[in-house]
Amino acid sequence: MNTRKFKLSDEKKRSTQRRVVRSWLIEHPELNPYKFTWDRFYRKITSRFRMLPSFLIIGGSRSGTTSLFAHLIEHPNIIPGSMKEVYFFQYFTNNKTSFYRSHFPIKRKNLITCESTSNYFVHPLIPARVHKLLPSVKLIVVLRNPVERAYSEFQKKVNLGEQITENFEDDIKSELKRIEIGNKKPELKIGNTNYDQFSFSHLRHGLYAQHLEKWLKFFPKEQLLILHAKDLYDNLDNIIAETFEFLNLPKYQIESRIEKNKIDKIRPLGGHERNIYKNIDSKTRTLFNVQNYPEMKSETRKFLQDFFRPYNEKLFEMIGRRFDWNDEK
């Protein structure tokens, strides 16, 4: 019997119970009608005693990172922060490190924490920012067929009312024009981080080899784990085991199973973990309620497969592994 494992589980349970009580007091309509909380202030003044992430899930968007995060934090050695996506390296780098630390748990022996912000992978300045603060951090990337990912992201934007056009083909044409302009006038990219990571860059977000190159300039391959999104559904147990091994964590059999990223099948933990699940759940429902969208036109799929093929081949060469993206229908 592994007594160390049970000790860690008990410690995590006690920590969770404290958060449940604190959450109950904060949300009680009579004891605290205005939901006043010292939580942020407390986190700030105790930031020096808090962990920094041991690993980051940096992308890609619409590729299963929410599912992966929810599975991983079931491990008794992993305590999540106050939120899944902190966006520190994207928007808040002018803030002090204490601000970033304030989002994570108090340091505890044999316990680690993490962050999962899928926009990190495509932002050109983030690799250097992460390396400066977390040079030894481990990085996890989940990659999905870029054709499917682009269509899924487009439909998500349509569902949220954020798309200028609801015609996928028109959207592709517009982005191809922007790519052409950027190639002809590279000076437009100088100091313009939005060029590469702009939220409507459905195609550019799928040029994985280009994004990966930027990360490999700062981090060795040994600190990077690349997962195939399809395996999260077809081969979940092995993927989770591989990830725990990559993180140097003891083996652990997760209890939850997620199909099509429906978080309601996860066993909630309570306290701020419960709030994280609520946040993931509402976000996931919003994003994945668009699964009834029409199928992509066959000619559009063929065009995108041809567009992404050379970038996919470069990626496969970089990682020494092939996915069946070029032939999927």
Question: Model-flagged regions — what are they?
Answer:
Residues 69-73, 90, 101, 131, ...:
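Non-transmembrane alpha-helical segments in soluble domains
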Residues 87-89, 117-121, 201-202, 229-233, ...:
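Short histidine/acidic/glycine/proline-rich micro-motifs that form metal-
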Residues 94-106, 163-256, 306:
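PAPS-dependent sulfotransferase catalytic domain
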Residues 2, 6-19, 213-309, 313, ...:
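The conserved 3'-phosphoadenosine-5'-phosphosulfate
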Residues 120-125, 315:
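Extended catalytic core of nucleotide-activated donor transferases of GT-like folds
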Residues 1-121, 132-185, 190-192:
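PAPS-dependent sulfotransferase catalytic core
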Residues 126-127, 150-155, 161-162, 238-240, ...:
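Short aromatic-enriched loop/helix-cap "lid" or pocket-rim segments at secondary-structure transitions
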